Amino acid sequence: MSYSSLYAWDNLWSAYRKAAKGKRGHQPAATFEHQVADQLVRLQAELQQKIYTPGGYHHFYIHEPKRRKISAAPFRDRVVHHALCNLIEPIFDARFIPDSYANRVGKGTHAAVDRLQAFARQYRYVLRMDIVKHFPSLDHAVLTAEIARVVRDPDLLWLIEQILASGVNVLKDEYAMVYFPGDDLFAINRPRGLPIGNLTSQFWSNVYMNPFDWFVKRELGCSAYLRYVDDFALFS
């Protein structure tokens, strides 16, 4: 897993195709596609020289099933997100528990519901919980430490930090800081939050929650456990 593999032409082309899927009628994708070769060459050079800088987000709200602030990255940044996930997501995915169902190939909502119903038929009790303001509160220091356990290439870590930094404070108005015993000034002021809408945010959410998943399975001994993003259930 090397940084040069990320900006290789084949990977960038694959990333562009994924980013454009279902978006070809939208202006940002159409503008990029009009000069796609030039756009990818420019992006490749920026990544290779490490002068790539993420652009600003376009924000809007959805109201189903509840009000949420969505942050859409510029199209070229979405290409970079796909290029990064093409490279590192399979490595992390192999480390996830089988019963983590969000934003994973072969999983999804229907599979999660099927598994939930199977557990419900098998067990008498269930504890269902969710994480309040999961994306707005997500601690970058905790996330980067977890990523760095697997990703050792300093250039890849540089790119990850660039993408993470671009989303700092995007959701600051959505989250009231919660303090825990032992928190100091450094912990309180650490960067937090992942923009809802980024491919990387969905992936990094699973990376962030993976130690918790394994804690429930191994330390608590709860084999009948499943999670979908920030919602999870334990059966007994």
PLM features per residue range, with description:
Residues R78, H82, N86, P90, ...:
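Short, residue-level hotspots on alpha-helical faces of the histone-fold
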Residues G22-A30, G55-H81, R95-K107, L127, ...:
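Short, conserved non-catalytic motifs in the polymerase core
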Residues M1, C85-D139:
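Active-site-proximal segment of RNA-dependent polymerases
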Residues A37-R67:
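Active-site-flanking structural segment that lines cofactor/substrate pockets
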Residues A15-A19, A83, L159-L164:
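Short alpha-helical scaffolding segments that buttress acidic/His motifs in well-ordered protein cores
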Residues S5-G22, P54-H59, N86-I91, R121:
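Short, compositionally biased low-complexity segments
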Residues Q39-R42, E46-L47, D99, A118-V229, ...:
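Conserved polymerase palm-domain catalytic core
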Residues M1-V41:
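Non-catalytic, polymerase-adjacent accessory regions of viral genome-replication enzymes
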